[in-house]
Amino acid sequence: MMDEELDFLLGTMQWSFSRLNSYYNCAYEWFLHYVECNKSENGFFGEYGSLIHKILEKYEKGELSLFELNEYYEDHFDEDVPHDAPPNKFVNIRQSYYDKGIDYLDNIDLDLEKYEILGVEKKVEFKINDKDFVGYI
């Protein structure tokens, strides 16, 4: 890819936290994914986050009670999070996340009657130094 093409691509790209974080973690992987447009499969962290989001959404919609969250988590963890976490010589990240998920859902204090939900994953678009950004809140 020529420098001019890369400058054009970067100048017209819509940026997000995940794009910036991807670059921060591995510039080459970011290049392959966002510049070369190589498909990458979802990894452990994305799958884990999607499972937690799905559980909380089911609770908000009334499909799961507060007392059913952990059971759903345990029943769906291996199916919804099939990829292994990256290796770490100090801790088994997969097991650590699994345990923290159980602890989180066991101790969650989420009384929806106390809150007015204004939106879920509401898209927000803005500019920083003439660069387009998108985020979800």
Where are these regions (language model features)?
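A non-catalytic, helix-rich entry segment at domain boundaries
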Residues: 51-128
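Nuclease catalytic cores
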Residues: 17-64, 98, 121-122
